């Protein structure tokens, strides 16, 4: 999969730069999401791995996408088809989303708790994480009864475990050593 990421990066960067320049980042993300879903369809996967000429492949792909792709989106599909890169569309979308998050200076923060958190608690968590990460954050809240009480916060590879379950696990580790 890392090969797909490496191959997808220049396509995602080009699409993102174009989208920013033309103030159409939302539209481009929608187009890429649709194209990635088409490319990951089982029948389309078979077609992409077949021996179709790049022109025929891009025409078929664009016809299937219909009005979902504008002219610039169709051009991206044509270039990717010419280079045999259509199977990497999902990775292109993932890279595009990462570029957008970096551009928007936002970080995805997962907050796991045993119960629904109040708006005041979410505001405090958001403010603390914005200060710690030096960027705006988008909270994705999840409920997990096994947490017992407290919260687990994940942002990228950082994990803050303030749950009772985590404390009990750490206590058990100390007692066993």
From Swiss-Prot:
Q: What does this protein do?
A: F(1)F(0) ATP synthase produces ATP from ADP in the presence of a proton or sodium gradient. F-type ATPases consist of two structural domains, F(1) containing the extramembraneous catalytic core and F(0) containing the membrane proton channel, linked together by a central stalk and a peripheral stalk. During catalysis, ATP synthesis in the catalytic domain of F(1) is coupled via a rotary mechanism of the central stalk subunits to proton translocation.
**Name listed for the protein in its UniProt record:** ATP synthase subunit delta
Q: Which GO terms describe its cellular component?
A: plasma membrane; proton-transporting ATP synthase complex
Q: Its family? A: Belongs to the ATPase delta chain family.
Keyword Transmembrane (UniProt): no
> Which gene does this sequence derive from?
atpH
Q: Which cysteines link up through disulfide bonds? A: none
- Organism ancestry: Bacteria, Pseudomonadati, Pseudomonadota, Gammaproteobacteria, Enterobacterales
Record's bilayer topology term: Peripheral membrane protein
Q: Which InterPro entries match?
A: ATP_synth_OSCP/delta_N_sf, ATPase_OSCP/d_CS, ATPase_OSCP/dsu
Q: Name one GO molecular function term.
A: proton-transporting ATP synthase activity, rotational mechanism
Q: What is its main location?
A: membrane
Q: Where in the cell is it found?
A: Cell inner membrane
């Amino acid at each position: 999969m890392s090969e797909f990421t490496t191959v997808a990066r220049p396509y995602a960067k080009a699409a993102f730069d174009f989208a920013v320049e033309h103030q159409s980042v939302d539209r481009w993300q929608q187009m890429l999401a649709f194209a990635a879903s088409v490319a990951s369809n089982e029948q389309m996967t078979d077609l992409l791995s077949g021996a179709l000429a790049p022109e025929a492949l891009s025409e078929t792909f664009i016809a299937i996408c219909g009005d979902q792709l504008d002219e610039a989106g169709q051009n991206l599909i044509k270039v990717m088809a010419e280079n045999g890169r259509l199977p990497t569309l999902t990775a292109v979308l993932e890279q595009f989303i990462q570029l957008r998050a970096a551009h928007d200076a936002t970080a995805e923060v997962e907050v796991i708790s045993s119960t629904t958190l109040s708006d005041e608690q979410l505001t405090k968590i958001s403010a603390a994480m914005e200060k710690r990460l030096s960027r705006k954050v988008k909270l994705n809240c999840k409920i997990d009864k096994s947490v017992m009480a407290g919260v687990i916060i994940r942002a990228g590879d950082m994990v803050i475990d303030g749950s009772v379950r985590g404390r009990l696990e750490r206590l058990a580790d100390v007692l066993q050593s």
